[in-house]
């Protein structure tokens, strides 16, 4: 933050034309014997209380030194070439004004943000009448750390006991201990190159070097896997037993809208901002679109609870060194489900079912979660037994982070972590109970007494983002390989579920007939018709993790059978119809998509 102090005999201002979409009310004003504080908010500045108190203390001290009877906080963008985004600058200036007002006994005024303004100033001209300052957020780090210490952690067990994390016995709870080490004691865990990155290359999950850092591209194999998970996310949402509406919307929103701007401030510099005729942000989840849509619905208490799901292309400006393929991205796809409930009591009841489904789905991968519950202190005091019940349902301790004296739009924010093959906790699924955004966006319903109410909203990603769910799948494969097992993708998620390999050209027609039969049953099947040896074709299919490799030669053709090599299993003969039935049973309850590649391998260009 850069500041210019002018001790003025008199100072007045008059707003003229708007300069920004984000702006205050156009109020004129004047002051005499004033310390005028011209403020440029820079990138990296934040509305942190400790930082603003440090700035305000200097402002007030300077006013006292020069004998000013009033202070004017004046937003002024011309002291820096590295300005913060308008929504951040407006908030910082507004909060600085409030902090100065609380510290100074005289008159404190603020000129409006977001306008071209005419002003008149008569500087007193004494040695201290013109001063400049540069303030950096890190100068307030001691006070900031003191504020952070107000957050504290407890371990809550299924029997309702509460423990200091430093004194808890973690015997037999290695994954939970890893979570506590990371979250409470801030210790870096694991190291080395994760094995799953090797797997991603074969399926076409890659960085896009011609885009921004943290943006991916998806080859055909990766694309079908992504879309299958998107389809499955909707199926899982419907399994909650409440009405679910699937929608689609835009990814850009105007910062001039109060609801958008106030919600966006929570993300600060992590936002993607698009400079156009108006300032736009790229959404970081589906919240904006779903809330903007539902505010226009006429909702009765009889409709509640219900959910909205969108596969939201989401954008978060992660630091370049933090991006990790498939796990931490700047652009990703979020199957974001928002559940609208009558009140906090109903929201908590719905989360019991939600919690069950979240654990059910990770269990299908042979994994489980360790959980971090972020709660406001008031919620913890008032609903501790609810958290104990969730711990009972998990059957193991949970880590609770308690945030005293702080106001959030949520009262509970739960993070569900797997522990990866390197021993690191990795957040996948989540849910939170939101008590603030319905009012912020104007979402209302009419209750039994014909009174207008604001619903309580549950935010959840049951599977996590599409990419993080797939990360969990591939990390499971890495754990399998580490244990000496053959990695095998779930058949429903395998880009190619069966590959038919003819022993010779003479068997190609029969191979195609087998492929036709399997494809008619909704099975993704391709045919290796290349001029390669049988052993190489089989090796290539195994390298591609095809779960069912079918070999057909003259003998199989004469018998009307196929020879099946099952990944991680044995080899056997079967009728093509029998194999189709087996695969159909295996993928029952999961979505189907066709093959996203040419059936014949000879028609596919090779990839580097």
From Swiss-Prot:
GO terms for cellular component: cytoplasm. Zn(2+) binds at residues 287, 338, 459. The keyword RNA-binding applies. One of its GO terms (biological process) is threonyl-tRNA aminoacylation. It is found in: Cytoplasm. Its main location: cytoplasm. Its cofactor is Zn(2+). Keywords: Aminoacyl-tRNA synthetase, ATP-binding, Cytoplasm, Ligase, Metal-binding, Nucleotide-binding, Protein biosynthesis, RNA-binding, tRNA-binding, Zinc. Its EC number is 6.1.1.3. It catalyses: tRNA(Thr) + L-threonine + ATP = L-threonyl-tRNA(Thr) + AMP + diphosphate + H(+). Binds 1 zinc ion per subunit. Residues 194-490, 195-490 are annotated as: Catalytic. InterPro entries: aa-tRNA-synt_IIb (IPR002314), aa-tRNA-synth_II (IPR006195), aa-tRNA-synth_II/BPL/LPL (IPR045864), Anticodon-bd (IPR004154), Anticodon-bd_dom_sf (IPR036621), DTD-like_sf (IPR023509), Thr-tRNA-ligase_IIa (IPR002320), Threonyl-tRNA_syn_edit_dom_arc (IPR015011). Residues 1-143 are annotated as: Editing domain. One of its GO terms (molecular function) is threonine-tRNA ligase activity. It is an enzyme of class 6 (ligase). Homodimer. Belongs to the class-II aminoacyl-tRNA synthetase family. The N-terminal domain is an archaea-specific tRNA-editing domain that hydrolyzes incorrectly charged L-seryl-tRNA(Thr). Catalysis of tRNA editing is performed by the charged tRNA itself. Catalyzes the attachment of threonine to tRNA(Thr) in a two-step reaction: L-threonine is first activated by ATP to form Thr-AMP and then transferred to the acceptor end of tRNA(Thr). Also edits incorrectly charged L-seryl-tRNA(Thr). PANTHER family: THREONINE--TRNA LIGASE, CHLOROPLASTIC_MITOCHONDRIAL 2 (PTHR11451:SF44), THREONINE-TRNA LIGASE (PTHR11451). This is Threonine--tRNA ligase. The gene is thrS.
